[in-house]
Amino acid sequence: MARRRATPTKAPPDLDARVAELYGGPLPSFVTRRDALARELRAAGDREGAAAVKALRKPRAVAWALDAGAHADPGALDRLRAAVDGVVEAQGGAGDLRGALDELRRAEQDLVAAAVEAAAGHGRPVDRTAVGAALRAVVGNPEALADLLAVRLVDAEALPDPGLAPVAAPAAGRGRATGGR
């Protein structure tokens, strides 16, 4: 008897949102949920998307907390994005640097609070100081910042603390599940 191929179903409408849910969801089930999404994409006929999702790495705890906070409180993430943009503009001479840095500190505090709350809500409390230090390092690293803004940061602990280094604009084209990395 000939094997009948399953008819592919339609691919998820917004893969980026699904990946953000994956990174913002419970850490212990990350691999199970990632693999389920990859199977869903493969069943829908999206082999490229399935391979890209399957290749996604499980985040480390502090990076996951930042992702979870960003996913749970998109407003905090938007404020961080706006504050980073404000600092970059002010560093270029187009504004009040001190005011922009104050706004960045407030935005960082908001996202750290969201991360700590989201992690606790998932039953995985994290150290507020460690999350704050990690966020400062992320803000100073364009690739890591782009990943956080896309809610898919994997590792913040490996980043050096930038100290008083300038804030970097996020790298363009980073953080897509199916994009050309």
Identify the meaning behind each predicted range:
Residues 11, 29, 56-60, 79-81:
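Short acidic alpha-helix initiation/capping motifs at coil-to-helix transition points
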Residues 14-18, 48, 52, 130, ...:
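Exposed alpha-helical structural elements
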Residues 21-29, 53, 71:
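A short N-terminal beta->alpha junction/helix N-cap motif
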Residues 23, 69-70, 75-180:
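Amphipathic alpha-helical coiled-coil/helical-stalk segments
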Residues 1-25, 32, 42-43, 169-181:
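Actinobacteria-biased recognition of intrinsically disordered, low-complexity terminal regions
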Residues 33-75, 86-94, 118-121:
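N-terminal interaction modules that seed assembly of large macromolecular complexes
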